[in-house]
């Protein structure tokens, strides 16, 4: 475990603007998420979202969650301050709004190869105007809630913030399920996990980050997601104004293609810390925190009126409840998730019952620390090592 001071972060994170070497020019840049309300009222199938997160990592989706997802038992309309936050990316000649996902390694997008009925409301990638097709290459992704997407693969120019590559594999959707079509705010996904889990066949392709990291000041990116506000991604440098104290580093386990790491314990509310650590993945593409049953049960024992209601597909409680904080111990650092973040959303529009931001990992064997966790932290994803760094947001 290494603690990294702000002074060191400033020295190592200098951008090309202050570099004395004229060539080759390297860069560091920041790109902001933006709010993307859909053209029509957006709904979220909460158990469907939960099922998709479990299946993404090869987990078993409980039958009760499958049934709740298929029945739409917990479909909610977010309030205005719960809009979807996405990131603008130029792909070929199109500007698309993508979900940045540290838990996957594909860059796939809505394209004009989709049937016209599935294009409505989305910004589209038009490969014929700029791309070279990778003949014989395809991709196909499916999730635990029944959603799926597939299509052909192209080589094209992709620009994120201040960095451009003309050698990026872009996966253009030609088939896509209704779950994706209905979310007209989102035009696709940009994976930031390790390239080893890219799904393109017959040969996996590199992620955008792996393609461009040699252009960056440092081969890293840092994430500052926010609660009820757009977040920020810093590529190539660490912004010391975005965190307090010091950054605590721990080794990242990339053996499964994810940003995995080991924690050193946890605590609930004002309770003492448990020394029982657990293996986890830092995933911007998962909304919830998914933990071992023992930890989940211990947490909801401290939430008045909470129940593992099978009809809703997960733990629920009264929306008026103030759940306790949840703390993850990483070395000497304690990453605190405020309880209000765990009061995630009403199980249906206007309901007084809320779906919990902490749910079971269904025996997955590792925990997923998704956005509910990440929105309290400034997290550094460094490919050298690799390693992960954590600090409280400023």
UniProtKB/Swiss-Prot annotation:
Family matches, as CDD domains: Aspergillopepsin_like
Propeptide: 21-69
Record keyword Kinase present: no
Molecular function, one GO term: aspartic-type endopeptidase activity
Localization, UniProt: Secreted
GO biological process, one term: proteolysis
Coiled-coil ranges (or none): none
PROSITE patterns reported in the protein's UniProt record: ASP_PROTEASE, PEPTIDASE_A1
Active site: 101, 283
Stretch forming the signal peptide: 1-20
Entry keywords, A to Z: Aspartyl protease, Disulfide bond, Hydrolase, Protease, Secreted, Signal, Zymogen
Stretches assigned to the Peptidase A1 domain: 85-391
EC number from the UniProt entry: 3.4.23.18
The protein's enzyme class: hydrolase
The protein's name: Aspergillopepsin-1
Biological source species: Aspergillus awamori
Annotated gene: pepA
């Amino acid at each position: 475990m290494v603690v990294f001071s702000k002074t060191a972060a400033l020295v190592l994170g200098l951008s090309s603007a202050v570099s004395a070497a004229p060539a080759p020019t390297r860069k560091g840049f920041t790109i902001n998420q933006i709010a993307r309300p859909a053209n029509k009222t957006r709904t979220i199938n909460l158990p469907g979202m939960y099922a998709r997160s479990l299946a993404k990592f090869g987990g078993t989706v409980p039958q009760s969650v499958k049934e709740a997802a298929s029945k739409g038992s917990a479909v909610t309309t977010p309030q205005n301050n719960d809009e979807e936050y996405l990131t603008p990316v130029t792909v070929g000649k199109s500007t698309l709004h993508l979900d940045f996902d540290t838990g996957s390694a594909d860059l796939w997008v809505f394209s004009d190869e989709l049937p016209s009925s599935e294009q409505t409301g989305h910004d589209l990638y038009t490969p014929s105007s700029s791309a070279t097709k990778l003949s014989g290459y395809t991709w196909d992704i499916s999730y635990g809630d029944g959603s799926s997407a597939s299509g052909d693969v192209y080589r094209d120019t992709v620009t994120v913030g201040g960095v451009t590559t003309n050698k990026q594999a872009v996966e253009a959707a030609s088939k896509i399920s209704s779950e994706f079509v209905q979310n007209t705010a989102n035009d696709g996904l940009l994976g930031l996990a390790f390239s080893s889990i890219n799904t393109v066949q017959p040969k996996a392709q590199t992620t955008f980050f792996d393609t461009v990291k040699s252009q960056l000041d440092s081969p890293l990116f840092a994430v500052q997601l926010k609660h009820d506000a757009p977040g920020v991604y810093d590529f190539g440098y660490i912004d010391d104004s975005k965190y307090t104290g010091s950054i605590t580093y721990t080794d990242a386990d990339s053996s499964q293609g994810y940003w995995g790491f080991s924690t050193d314990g946890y605590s609930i509310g004002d309770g003492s810390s448990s020394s029982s650590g657990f293996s986890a993945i830092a995933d911007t593409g998962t909304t919830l925190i998914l933990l071992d049953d023992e930890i989940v049960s211990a947490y909801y024992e401290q939430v008045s009126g909470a129940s593992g209601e099978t009809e809703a597909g997960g733990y629920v409680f009264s929306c008026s409840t103030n759940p306790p904080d949840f703390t993850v111990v990483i070395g000497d650092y304690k990453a605190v998730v405020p309880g209000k973040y765990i009061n995630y959303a009403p199980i249906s529009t206007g309901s007084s019952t809320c779906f919990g931001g902490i749910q079971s990992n269904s025996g997955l064997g590792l925990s997923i620390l998704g956005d509910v966790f990440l929105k309290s932290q400034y997290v550094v994803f460094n490919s050298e090592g690799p390693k992960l760094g954590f600090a409280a947001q400023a």
